[in-house]
């Protein structure tokens, strides 16, 4: 094995939001002036936690089947005996022993695209918990295939392009039939990174009715959209899902957040057993550059959509050691260092998440899954110094089997300008979008964090992991952290408040979400709660600040890594498009599955401190807060 020398430096950029009011800006389709928040999917999910599930199963005299998929299927049939559905081909058993099975409701052979059912099966083959957003209203009596009075897919494409002001030329579009019922790919278009697609599906609307729609898929770079266009009125777009998650947010060595925390250090062979082919091979080919099984890193100064022929540093002996100083400018003068840093951070995070259970079967990002389940050919495409934007970053997460795509931008908030690849937090934040989107709802469904509140939690998970990874041995529960301070050139960072366990420093409570209308603001509330959770577990189990966790029977032995593990496991347990209450319950269930509930009261205390206690209730307009603990705590 050749030695790999990585001179690593990291940092983390985001939008400059210094005050709470500034976080109320809407999410806008990049540079096209369309408010995407107005098209978000409604929250429809319900979640039955492990305690309630045990009571329900006992009341039903429900018995397990021969395998976990059959048991899960039996539960769905017993819960919705009159509904039709299909098993999604992405079930797997997590490293915590919980089996995850996902179902999609159908009507007349068409998917009801936002009607999902997830069932979690424990080690003994019994139902552990489940969630669903199945449609309970009246299904149309007649199949739309009988009279075929719906519009053709080309009109739907043109309707989406017009309504969302997309840079796609569709005047000469023609629909070509592809595999799948009423599924098409468009030819004769331009402006999208890949051929647009359309599929006829039903959609649950906000008012509880069912609409027949064309699900139109368009990847235009900054946005990768699923637009639900009414199949009878092509000028009406009901909802939009965006696979791209944007940030407003950095490695030296792993754990250093940005250039203020240390100096570049060289590492030899830094990969772990989570990357059996090393970082420079996919098991078939060896690459003398920043390419391997988990990621491919390159510069992208033009902001274009191609990447295979873009520039990457080359080293036959795998020594990637390049100069960088804070005075170097412009960022292109140190692109070798930047690409190397981005490659290092992405791979290092892949290996850490793999140890927690984000592996092949769970839908991680790898070319070669080595016969371990899931779909391969989907490493992370990570672009350094991407010219398609500034002062931001984003990550696109299509379903398992298609590569994720990260775009890291330069920051004009300082002189000389700063490179987002040098702040580890932004890379971690962005990659975490890939983690949460693959786990929530299953690897085959990347549309399960697209409601406003669930999308906010997607941002919050990114902030939480970025912050947890940068903790230092000297830190205590009184330590505060900002987000994006280096990139934004502002010590306060880009969030409304610092992450802190002090209620005066950070006063966010569950009911604060009532006044927030933007995902990053909502995400700050969620990440604040997870920060409380982490410090509660550190106080209970100690804080080991080694780069990698030490496991005993699958359980991390320190509070910091334990928090990261159960938060991640909770993502796989919760329903598609969850709310705060359901995500909290899923984390409590994750601890129950992992430790038999040893940390139940510690977790409850953390959430209760921030108003998400035992009596908290979700309502999209008026959430009810609670500092109450459950009986026994």
Curated annotation (Swiss-Prot):
Annotated Gene Ontology MF terms?
Answer: metalloendopeptidase activity; zinc ion binding
Q: What class of enzyme is it?
A: hydrolase
InterPro entries, A to Z: FTP_domain, Fungal_virulence_M36, Peptidase_M36, Peptidase_M4/M1_CTD_sf
Gene Ontology annotations for the cellular component aspect, listed alphabetically: extracellular region
Requisite cofactors: Zn(2+)
Q: Which residues are Zn(2+)-binding?
A: 429, 433
Query: Which UniProt keywords are given for this protein, alphabetically ordered?
Result: Glycoprotein, Hydrolase, Metal-binding, Metalloprotease, Protease, Secreted, Signal, Virulence, Zinc, Zymogen
Annotated Pfam families: FTP, Peptidase_M36
Recorded superkingdom:
Eukaryota
Q: Report the cofactor remark.
A: Binds 1 zinc ion per subunit.
* Cellular localisation: Secreted
Protein name, per record:
Extracellular metalloproteinase 3
Q: Which organism is it from?
A: Arthroderma otae (strain ATCC MYA-4605 / CBS 113480)
Classification lineage = Eukaryota, Fungi, Dikarya, Ascomycota, Pezizomycotina
């Amino acid at each position: 094995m050749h030695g790999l020398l990585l001179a690593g430096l990291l940092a983390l950029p985001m939008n400059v939001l210094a005050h709470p009011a500034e976080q109320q800006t809407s999410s806008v389709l990049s540079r096209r002036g369309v408010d995407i928040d107005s098209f978000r999917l409604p929250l429809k999910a319900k979640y039955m936690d492990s305690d309630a599930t045990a009571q329900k199963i006992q009341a039903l005299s429900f018995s397990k089947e021969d395998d976990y998929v059959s048991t899960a299927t039996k539960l769905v049939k017993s819960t919705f005996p009159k509904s039709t559905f299909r098993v999604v081909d992405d079930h797997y058993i997590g490293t915590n022993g919980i089996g995850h099975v996902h179902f999609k409701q159908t009507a007349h052979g068409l998917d009801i695209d936002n009607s999902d059912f997830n069932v979690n099966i424990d080690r003994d083959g019994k139902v552990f918990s489940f969630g669903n957003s199945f449609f309970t209203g009246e299904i149309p009596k007649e199949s739309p295939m009988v009279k075929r009075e719906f519009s053709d897919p080309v009109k739907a494409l043109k309707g989406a392009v017009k309504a969302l002001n997309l840079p796609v030329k569709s005047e000469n579009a023609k629909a070509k039939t592809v595999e799948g019922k009423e599924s098409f790919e468009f030819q004769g278009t331009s402006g999208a990174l890949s051929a647009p697609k359309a599929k006829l599906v039903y959609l649950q609307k906000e008012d509880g009715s069912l609409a027949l729609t064309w699900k139109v898929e368009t990847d235009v770079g900054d946005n990768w959209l699923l637009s639900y266009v009414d199949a009878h009125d092509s000028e009406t777009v009901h909802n939009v899902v965006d696979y791209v998650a944007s940030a407003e947010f950095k490695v030296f060595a792993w754990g250093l957040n940005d250039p203020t925390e240390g100096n570049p250090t060289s590492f030899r062979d830094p990969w772990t057993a989570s990357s059996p082919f090393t970082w420079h091979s996919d098991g078939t080919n060896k690459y003398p550059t920043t390419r391997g099984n988990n990621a491919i890193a390159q510069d992208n100064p033009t902001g274009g959509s191609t990447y295979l022929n873009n520039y990457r540093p080359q080293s036959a002996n795998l020594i990637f050691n390049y100069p960088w100083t804070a005075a170097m400018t412009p960022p292109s003068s140190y692109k070798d260092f930047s690409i190397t840093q981005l490659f290092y951070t992405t791979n290092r995070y892949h290996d850490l998440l793999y140890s927690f259970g984000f592996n092949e079967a769970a839908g991680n990002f790898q070319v070669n899954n080595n016969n371990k389940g899931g779909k391969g050919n989907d490493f992370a495409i990570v672009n350094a110094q991407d010219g398609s934007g500034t002062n931001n970053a984003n990550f696109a997460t299509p379903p398992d089997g298609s590569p994720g795509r990260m775009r890291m931008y330069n920051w004009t908030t300082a002189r000389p300008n700063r490179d987002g690849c040098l702040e580890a937090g932004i890379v971690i934040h962005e990659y975490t979008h890939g983690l949460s989107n693959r786990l929530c709802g299953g690897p085959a469904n990347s549309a399960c964090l697209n409601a406003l509140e669930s999308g906010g939690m997607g941002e919050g998970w990114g902030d939480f992991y970025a912050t947890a990874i940068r903790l230092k041995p000297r830190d205590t529960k009184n330590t505060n952290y900002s987000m994006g301070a280096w990139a934004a050139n502002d010590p306060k960072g880009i969030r409304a408040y610092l992450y802190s366990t002090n209620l005066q420093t950070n006063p966010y409570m569950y009911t604060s979400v009532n006044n927030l209308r933007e995902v990053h603001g909502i995400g700050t509330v969620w990440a604040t709660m997870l920060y409380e959770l982490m410090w509660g577990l550190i106080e209970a189990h100690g804080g080991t600040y080694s780069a990698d966790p030490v496991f005993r029977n699958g359980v991390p032995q320190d509070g910091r890594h334990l928090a990261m593990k159960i938060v991640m496991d909770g993502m796989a347990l919760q329903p598609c498009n969850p709310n705060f209450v359901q995500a909290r319950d899923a984390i409590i269930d994750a601890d129950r599955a992992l430790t038999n509930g040893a940390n139940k009261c510690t977790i409850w205390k953390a959430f209760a401190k921030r108003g998400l206690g035992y009596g908290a209730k979700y309502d999209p307009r008026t959430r009810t807060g609670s500092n109450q603990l459950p009986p026994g705590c």
